[in-house]
Amino acid sequence: MSRKQLALFEPTLVLQALKEAVKKLNPQAQWRNPVMFIVWIGSLLTTCICIAMASGAMPGNALFSAAISGWLWVTVLFANFAEALAEGRSKAQANSLKGVKKTAFARKLREPKYGAAADKVPADQLRKGDIVLVEAGDIIPCDGEVIEGGASVDESAITGESAPVIRESGGDFASVTGGTRILSDWLVIECSVNPGETFLDRMIAMVEGAQRRKTPNEIALTILLIALTIVFLLATATLWPFSAWGGNAVSVTVLVALLVCLIPTTIGGLLSAIGVAGMSRMLGANVIATSGRAVEAAGDVDVLLLDKTGTITLGNRQASEFIPAQGVEEKTLANAAQLASLADETPEGRSIVILAKQRFNLRERDVQSLHATFVPFTAQSRMSGINIDNRMIRKGSVDAIRRHVEANGGHFPADVDQKVDQVARQGATPLVVVEGSRVLGVIALKDIVKGGIKERFAQLRKMGIKTVMITGDNRLTAAAIAAEAGVDDFLAEATPEAKLALIRQYQAEGRLVAMTGDGTNDAPALAQADVAVAMNSGTQAAKEAGNMVDLDSNPTKLIEVVHIGKQMLMTRGSLTTFSIANDVAKYFAIIPAAFAATYPQLNALNIMRLHSPDSAILSAVIFNALIIVFLIPLALKGVSYKPLTASAMLRRNLWIYGLGGLLVPFIGIKVIDLLLTVCGLV
C-alpha cells in the first residue's frame, strides 16, 4: 500500500479501526482521555439505570433511558474510532515499509577496496564498520557511506519516488539506506549502524511505538478541557437539588445527557486523532518526524535558516570564468585550478576541470600517477587543493586563502580583491587560487535563484516568519543573492560555529528556529534547532542530531514542514473553537426541555421549537455523537491552510468555525428532532 495513495477511508482500515474502537472501551484505555472517560462513566451509569427501570426496580421510562445510554456508548465508540483510524493509517504506512525488510545475504569484503576477497554472510549479522560490496540487482544490506564507486540506486521502497538517484563516494551523495536496490554499476559501502539500528528499523519503530507521547500544546489543551469538564460537572450536579426543591426532580439520565452535551466532547474525542494525523501527514510528505513534539514545534516556528545551495538556488554552481591576477596568464590559472580540482568530486570541482578542458584543452590527469597528495575541503580550512612536485596549490574562499597566503609570508594582491568584489556583486561565488604564497586569480562559480522562491518568502513574511539565508559565500555575494531571492537576512561565510551561535541568538530572543542539514558538521546546529530536518542522503550524525528526516533530501521541504505543522495547530484550534461554540446550541436544546416543567419561564429559551422534552434531549445527544464522525475527515486531513497573518487567520477561523459551531448544531438538532417525530420514535 503506497504511503502517498492511502485513501482516507480504506475499507480494511475502517474495519480494523472499528475492532480497535471496541477494544478501547476498557477503563484503562478510556482513562487516557479524561473528557471521554466522563462520557464512558455516564454511559455505564445510564445503562445501569436502564436495566433497573426495565426490571421494575426503579421508576421511569426505560425506553428513553435505553436510547440515551445507547447513544452515549456510540459517542465513546466514535471517539475511539477516530483515534483508531488515525493510528491505523500510520501503521499501514509503516507496514508498507516492512515489506522492504528482507532476509538477504551480503558480500562482506576482507579489505576496504573493490576486488578484495569477500565472504557471504547474512545481512542481519553485519556490524558497524563492516565493508560490503553491492552490484547491479543487489539490495543494499545496511545503512552506510559509499567509500568507493558510483551507482544508480532505486530508493522508491523508502521514498516512494520512482526516479533513481546517483550515489557515489565523496560529496553530499555518499549516504545509502538499507533496503534500497542497486540498478547499475557497483558500490563499496562501510556500514554505519548495527543490526536493529537502521533507518528503516527506526522508521517502523517510531510509527509503531508503544504509546504516543502528548505534546506540550496538547497537554495544555487537555488541562483546559478537564477544567471545563469539572466546571460543567459541578454545575450539572447543583441542578438536581434546584429541580427537586421546585417539586419536579430531574432524572439522573437527563442530567447525564446534559453533562455530556455541555462538556467539549467533540474536541475531546478528536484530539488524539489530530496529533496522530499530523505525524501521518508529515510521513505523507516523505518526512519522518521523531515525535509529535517536532511536528507541533514546526507550527510555531518563526525563524527559518535556509541553506542557499539547493534551497534558494538550483544548487548546481558551475565554474563560468577564470579571472587571472595581474601578471598571470589565464592558462596558468586554469592549469593550477584544474590540478587542485582533480580529486575534488563535488559538482563545483568537476565543473572547474571541465572548464579548463574546454578553454585550454587541458586534459584530466590521474592524481595517483602524478604522485600527488590531495588536500580535501573541511569546514574549518574552507579550502582544498593538491601537493605535487613541491608545489602547494590551494583553492578556496577569499578569507581562507588570504590567511593561507599571509601564513606563508606572502601578500594578497589588491587587484585580486577588486576582482573578487566584481564577481561577488554579480551574484557569483568567487574562489581564489593560490600556489605557495602567490595568488594566481579567481574562479567565478555561477548559480541560479529558483523561480517563484521570492513569492514563497513573501508569503512566509506575511505569516510572521523570518527567513535567513545561510551560505559560505562572502558578504557581497550573499547580499546580492539575498536581495534577488527576497530573504529577510543572511549569514555569510558561515561556519558550523557561526550557525550554532546564530540559532542560540534567536532562541535567546524567544524565537523558535528551524533548519536543514546533511553533513556531520551540521550536527551541532541540528541538535540545537527546535525543528531540525536532516537529509536522508546526509550523514548518520546529521540524521541522529535532527528530529525529522526528509526522505527526498530536498532542502526546500523545510517550508512544507512548517506548513504541515501550522496546519496541525490550526486544525486543533479550529475544532476546539467549533466544539466550545457547539455547547451554546445544545444548551438551548436541553435546558428548556429538562427544567421547563419545574420553571415554565425557561420555555422562552426553546427557540428551536423542539417537539417534546424527550425528543429535545435525545436529539442533542444524537447530534453530539454524530458530529464527531462528520469531523473525522477534517481531523485527519487538516483544515484548509492559507498563508495569512496571525490576526487575519484568527478572524477567518472565528468566522468559519466559531460561527459554524453556533449555527450547525441548531440546524442539526432541529433536523434530528423532526426525523424522530416523523418516525414516531418519541
From Swiss-Prot:
Mode of membrane association: Multi-pass membrane protein
Top-level taxon in the UniProt lineage: Bacteria
Protein's recorded name: Potassium-transporting ATPase ATP-binding subunit
Organism field: Escherichia coli O17:K52:H18 (strain UMN026 / ExPEC)
Keyword terms: ATP-binding, Cell inner membrane, Cell membrane, Ion transport, Magnesium, Membrane, Metal-binding, Nucleotide-binding, Phosphoprotein, Potassium, Potassium transport, Translocase, Transmembrane, Transmembrane helix, Transport
Record EC number: 7.2.2.6
A GO term from the CC aspect: plasma membrane
Residues the record lists as binding ATP: D344, E348, F377, T378, A379, Q380, S381, R382, M383, S384, K395
EC class of the enzyme, as a word: translocase
Subcellular location, record wording: Cell inner membrane
NCBIfam families linked to this entry: ATPase_P-type (TIGR01494), kdpB (TIGR01497)
One Pfam family linked to the record: Hydrolase
List of residues binding Mg(2+): D518, D522
Gene that this polypeptide is encoded by: kdpB
Record's catalysed reaction(s): K(+)(out) + ATP + H2O = K(+)(in) + ADP + phosphate + H(+)
Cell inner membrane is among the record's keywords: yes
Molecular-function GO term, any one: ATP binding
Assembly: The system is composed of three essential subunits: KdpA, KdpB and KdpC.
InterPro entries named among the record's database cross-references: ATPase_P-typ_cyto_dom_N, ATPase_P-typ_P_site, ATPase_P-typ_TM_dom_sf, ATPase_P-typ_transduc_dom_A_sf, HAD-like_sf, HAD_sf, P-type_ATPase_bsu_IA, P_typ_ATPase
Residue positions of the active site: D307 (4-aspartylphosphate intermediate)
Keyword field contains Secreted: no
PROSITE patterns cross-referenced by the UniProt entry: ATPASE_E1_E2
UniProt family annotation: Belongs to the cation transport ATPase (P-type) (TC 3.A.3) family. Type IA subfamily.
